Design a protein with these regions (language model features):
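Register position in tetratricopeptide repeats
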Residues: 19, 53-54, 89-92, 96, ...
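TPR alpha-solenoid repeat register
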Residues: 9, 43, 77, 86, ...
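Structural marker of alpha-solenoid helical repeat scaffolds
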Residues: 2-4, 36, 70-74, 112-113, ...
Length: 335
């Protein structure tokens, strides 16, 4: 169309928006591409993946199936990784719907060697969701371990299985054993800190996060996690704000870190400022956790109708989000 950027240029712009975590704007660009050139396969894949991450399952499934249809008409080598990505995403959509037979059927279509481990990880997750956690762990442990990257992938997969099953103590111990072999591994330390928090061991969480920050002063996730944890407990709020502002220095504009900053402001009584920050973060990244916080701030400001709208949107994004469910239960609200 005359005067319109080429889809390839618009695709590059969409990827730049994704890199900047401007997801809603990226999605708009992808939708323009698929409307203007419906045979542009890559746009369907990225659009479907993004929609799936936002829990918009029906449009995500449609976009991913359209990608598969287009990709299978083109040379296999051009799309082998993309097809594997699409099959994994379609499997996860089926898994979220508890259609485990369909989830496994999508995984069976993956034949790209580089993605077979990811497929087995998904199979293990499906087993765990069916209450077969021991079987799932055995499947993960049976995977090859030919190099350090594969060993790490297996560890991460097993820890994730245990975390999703809320088996926090065995997951914590598994990471502890790995840290005994690699005591300077800050990624393992960070993951163990997050599990310590789930177990309610907040002093251990803080000790581990401070260890991470000392070893990696630019690790913004550690500043954010510690700051948010303090804010959530209403403790040392000026320090919490300082930690989160430090995280934003390393990751400016990150909507999840902005969410943490807003939560500190809210805890300090700065409700209007908290609402402003959260509105901006939610616009940039519609997410159930951010929706929970934005709704609560609006509720406290007497904007009950707007709060309920945001909470309803949050439930559509992720009905199982713990923060959102806890917020609604605590405030005794049925949006």
């Amino acid at each position: 169309m005359e005067g319109q950027p080429l889809p390839e240029i618009r695709m590059g712009y969409a990827r730049a928006l994704l890199d900047a975590q401007r997801y809603a704007e990226a999605l708009q660009q992808l939708q323009v591409i698929t409307q203007q050139r419906p045979e542009f396969a890559e746009a369907w894949l990225v659009q479907g993946t993004l929609l799936a991450q936002d829990n918009q399952l029906a449009p995500a499934e449609a976009a991913l199936k359209r990608y598969v249809e287009l990709a299978q008409k083109q040379p296999q080598e051009e799309h082998s990784r993309g097809l594997a990505q699409a099959f994994l995403a379609l499997s996860q959509i089926a898994e979220k719907r508890k259609d485990y037979a369909m989830a496994n059927a999508w995984l069976d279509r993956i034949d790209n060697a580089g993605d077979l481990m990811a497929a087995q990880n998904r199979r293990a997750s499906i087993l765990a969701q069916q209450g077969k956690l021991d079987e799932a762990r055995k499947l993960i442990r049976s995977l090859p371990e030919r190099n350090p990257a594969e060993a790490r992938a297996k560890l991460t997969a097993e820890v994730n299985l245990l975390r999703e099953a809320r088996q926090y103590k065995p997951a914590f111990e598994l990471l502890g054993a790995a840290l005994a072999k690699s005591p300077n591994d800050t990624d393992l330390m960070y993951d163990q800190a997050m599990l310590a928090e789930k177990m309610g061991n907040l002093p251990e969480m803080e000790r581990l996060l401070r260890q991470v920050i000392a070893a990696r002063p630019d690790f913004h996730h550690a500043y954010n996690a510690l700051g948010y944890s303090l804010a959530e407990r209403g403790q040392r709020l000026p320090e919490a704000r300082q930690l989160i502002q430090k995280a934003l220095e390393f990751a400016p504009g990150d909507p999840f870190i902005s969410d943490s900053l807003a939560w500190v402001e809210f805890r300090m009584g700065n409700k209007a400022e908290a609402a402003r920050i959260l509105e901006e973060a939610y616009k940039k990244r519609p997410d159930a956790e951010i929706a929970a916080h934005l709704g609560e701030v609006l509720w406290s400001l007497g904007q009950a109708d707007r709060a309920k709208v945001v909470w309803r949107e949050g439930l559509l994004l992720n009905n199982d989000n713990e923060t959102l469910q806890e917020t609604l239960k605590r405030l005794k609200v049925k949006p």
